[in-house]
Design a protein with these regions (language model features):
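Domain-level signature for soluble enzymes in the chorismate/prephenate branch of the shikimate pathway
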Residues: 2-207
Length: 207
């Protein structure tokens, strides 16, 4: 795991009126087992706790839901990976502000199946792989296969579908694999990733 602060506007100095004794909330994509949860927990451990800021983690179905929570209170923040295509919209919003950028590499990614499922490589030519949209190019780069995907909201949701028998193969991470009792038939890599921390912005009427 690598966690490095690239840009620091500081949660504490965002508004001098805030007391570090107040509880802040870090919102990100859930459910448990996502790479976003992993990054948020590492951010809390390596930044907010060291800065003396009390914080809790809140997981949501979409990053847009996280942002809606952030817009409701100056004590609500959202962590989003730069691999998420929709992050470009968050940078444009006048009611949000970018507070920090940091690096936190993801857990290992790979193809996971249920225990007892008999996997063979030729399945990639015809099987449908359940995955979050962001990491799907791992299949292309590591297997040279043009596969079909069933897209879901998170890597954890992908693993859950395999556990429940709704899909046979998931592209997921190590945390979700463990959580849902799956095993990897292929491992790819821990993805080097940077993340943005957003807070509620202050809109100034210039008219």
């Amino acid at each position: 795991m690598v966690l490095m602060i690239i840009l620091d506007n500081s949660i504490q100095t965002k508004s001098k009126a805030y007391s570090i004794s107040k509880l802040i909330t870090i919102n990100t994509l859930g459910p448990e087992g996502t790479s976003s949860e992993y990054a948020a927990k590492n951010f809390i451990t390596n930044f907010t706790l060291l800065q003396g800021v009390n914080s809790k983690l809140s997981l949501h179905d979409t990053f847009e839901s996280c942002i809606e929570k952030t817009l409701q209170s100056p004590l609500e923040y959202t962590i989003v990976p730069h691999a998420y295509d929709g992050i470009k919209h968050f940078y444009m919003r006048p009611d949000l502000q970018l507070l920090q950028i940091f690096r936190c590499d993801t857990p290992m990614y790979g193809l996971a199946v249920r225990p007892g499922f008999e996997y063979t490589d030729d399945m990639l030519d015809k099987a449908v792989i359940v995955s979050h949209p962001s990491p799907i190019n791992l299949i292309k780069y590591f297997t040279r296969k043009d596969v079909t995907f069933d897209l879901v909201n998170s890597t954890s949701a992908a693993a859950k579908r395999v556990k429940e028998g709704l899909s046979d193969i998931a592209l997921t991470n190590e945390l979700a694999r463990q959580k849902y009792g799956l095993h990897f038939v292929k491992t790819f890599k821990s993805i080097p990733m940077s993340w943005s921390l957003f807070g509620k912005g202050e809109i100034h009427d210039e008219n």
